[in-house]
Amino acid sequence: MHRYRSHTCAQLRKSDVGSSVRLSGWVHRVRDHGGLLFIDLRDHYGLTQIVADPDSPAFKVAETVRGEWVIRVDGEVKARLSETVNANLPTGEIEIFAREIEVLSAAKELPLPVFGEPDYPEDIRLKYRFLDLRRDTLHKNIVARTKIIAEMRKRMGDVGFTEFSTPILTASSPEGARDFLVPSRIHPGTFYALPQAPQQYKQLIMVSGFDRYFQIAPCFRDEDPRADRLPGEFYQLDLEMSFVEQDDVLNTMEPVLRGVFETFANGKPVTQKFQRIPYDVAMRKYGSDKPDLRNPIEMQAVSDHFRDSGFKVFANILANDPKAEVWGIPAKTGGSRAFCDRMNSWAQGEGQPGLGYIFWRKEGDKLEGAGPLAKNIGEERTEAIRQQLGLADGDAAFFVAGDPKKFVSFAGAARTRAGEELNLVDRERFELCWIVDFPFFEWNEEEKKIDFAHNPFSMPQGGIDALNGEDLLGIKAFQYDMVCNGFEIASGGIRNHLPETMVKAFETVGLDRATVEERFGGLYRAFQYGAPPHGGMAAGIDRVVMLLVGAKNLREVTMFPMNQQAYDLLMNAPSEASPQQLRELALRVAPTKKDA
């Protein structure tokens, strides 16, 4: 028999009754039932109940073991009594009567429990992550992550992609965040950078004559803490394709990612045909470029109903600003004054003056609009709004006014809030879509200049002719995002593979040819030697896994994450370098203000 085990703790069944077996694992818990000791023994695979009676030579050792001790058990498989069968456990029909127990490793008193879902401070959980990972939910999340990545690899291979690895030590590149820099000992005073994404390398792979590339790529970004991102590093399914247009990438990757979701959706419906929603339409309908389409609320412009109306606040806004609009946010079943007042209070908490509303209710046989807005604009306009928004008895609508560019994010938040408060969101499905036609440029109000709105390497729609035109802020990019349940899970674009178009795009944001050649030298040089039209995307693995397992945050699907202050409490990183290490790297640490 093997030194430690003949079976795992999830393997034995009623058909094994009478067998002599050996198991090893962690003591999940110990229970004393009238002299009999019951030990739940746990390993990576599952749980088996061990029984030690006072007549067994194993009993003396069994009395000493405590939670999370590691033990080896030799014993005989016996059937449980019918009244003690645990139908929720794969091994629930049997138990092991112990003949011998060996303690392989004792454990100190635990700083946090490893069963159940303990509400412990996150810093304690991260410091003792090796204990936290023993919890069933977290353990299963990590295993699911591995299976999801394996499924991605399989499906990418099935549609003709080849996996390549790209360098981790590379040159600094402005991807939109700060780089993590690595000093070079051999070349003092110079630095490598950890890649924010394999963007330039994957394009170079296409220029090198390969056709369909992918990898599970680690990405490193020195960003300020954000609730929806892991500090430091994250992983993405990165891919690129040669000789493709936008539709080719979308038509290739939609079935791949839909298939991944269907495999791990645990029976929840998954969108079969993804909508392709232009960015401008998404912002107008949903107030977001990553809309949760499980929420049925769609906003509409209702400016005409308030123009020259008795509600002077909105009427004056429309009269004094040609850019101004009034948007209506329909809220089915929201037709109570209490709910409308709650939404108004929420808006004030968000820094807004309030949130105008109308709600409709039956007065006898007549459907009437109620609330201050309805009184001010009159019955005819109120009825026209109701009909446009498709509302009925017991429904409500909320209104925002001004320049849409200034209120759109608040309007989107109000849509989300109303959908959640009214339980309009179907949480038992995965709703996926594409967002397309992103703006290529945006106006930087602080610096009073044009900037790239998203990925600077994307091809502008209309090419160099559009860049030479006058309506620069009207140019759209061949860029697209995949969105699921309100989360951006993938982003990509058709690349700007023409050197002169690339230079012109960067000149528009203030970077001259010399700067482009210096900062993107490898890519720019490669484009001089025959670059195929190409495009691709990257899907965020951490977010995909989080959605599929139903985790509340990204740390629940990551094995060893940092905390929100970008500190690794388990390994105590970052840490100070020794004087010798600094000398070898020709570095000196400048004193901070507190040290000065």
Curated annotation (Swiss-Prot):
It comes from the Bacteria. Residues 199-202 are annotated as: Aspartate. This is Aspartate--tRNA(Asp/Asn) ligase. PROSITE patterns: AA_TRNA_LIGASE_II. It catalyses: tRNA(Asx) + L-aspartate + ATP = L-aspartyl-tRNA(Asx) + AMP + diphosphate. L-aspartate binds at E175, R221, H454, R495. It comes from Mesorhizobium japonicum (strain LMG 29417 / CECT 9101 / MAFF 303099). Belongs to the class-II aminoacyl-tRNA synthetase family. Type 1 subfamily. The gene is aspS. SUPFAM superfamilies: Class II aaRS and biotin synthetases, GAD domain-like, Nucleic acid-binding proteins.
